[in-house]
């Protein structure tokens, strides 16, 4: 029978904290803990990393994966920037896509990017007469709806913005529902955490508590997750 002491030991092992991961094991860990985040003390544009998990320089490794567009940028947990594998974009779009509420500025930029893109913010400013403080929130609104994509493949400031479906023609952001996406990602996180509460999962994914709790109940009903017994 598992005790909390056993849980802690197994969690540390599964998070590669007691023995650092090689590349294949690291890729699996990154997938299970996605979206990957920038460490808060890193400089602008630095790749995401999993601190103290890899037996190699994972900042350099993930930088290479960014340049190859294996890792791509989006706005996920509560609108925060994160990086996921491009092959997982449809799943995370289903998990995080927000309903699009158009504004005058967001529609102007969406049409402009569709006609002239890719464009950086400086070009948008020049072509529309809008200020950066007007452009940025409009782009974030479009980004959170998975209507535009910011191509941050290196640490430079001069990043191009594309229509989402131009960069991901085979991805339908509406194909996977949030419920279905949660049923896929929660077992990944539970495997790494060993013991996972709905509150923990809510905090990790930045999603409504009721959605997370309902998905965990369904996974328990299916026998994929097992309820903890004291």
Locate predicted features.
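Long, low-complexity intrinsically disordered regions
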Residues: 1-230
